[in-house]
Structure formats: structure tokens, C-alpha cells
Amino acid sequence: MINLEDILDMCPLTREEVAAIGEHEHVEGVAAATLADYLMHLRKGPQEVNRMICEDIRAALHRDDVEHARKLFAALKHFMATHPEAARGSE
């Protein structure tokens, strides 16, 4: 039987990136991984993931959770390094 770890292993994003999408959309586990995979296959999906993680960082900073914002920033930095098509304005 396929479990969450198997699904995360098939996803093109890291666990931290999937968690950020899940945080943004208020879903966890399989739902977050499925959404992440779906977004990465859309034409502007990587840019949407970029936007979601940026919004999560802003939300963490607004509630003074600097440590969480730091972790999200690290996830964003890795995401942008591995998915340059996610940059705003890229086609």
C-alpha cells in the first residue's frame, strides 16, 4: 500500500516546500503533497508555489514568528534554486 512517505518521494518538491503549501492552503499530508504535485504541472504553477511560500513568510512575520519565517525562507531559497521557472515574470 502507498503511504505518505511514498507520495512525498514522488513529489517534485521537498517536504518543507510541501509543508509550506499545506500551511497556506490549510491541508496536511496527502492532500498537501497532491496539491503540490498538481501545481508543479500547471503552466504557471511554480509561480503560484512561489507566491504561496512568500505569503506564508509574510504571515509568520506578522505574528512575530521569526524562526518559522526563517525556515520558510530556507524552503523558498531552495525552491527558487531548483525551480527557476518560478521566478515572477518568467515564461
Map each language-model feature to its residues.
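Long, non-catalytic architectural segments outside compact domain cores
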Residues: 1-52, 71-91
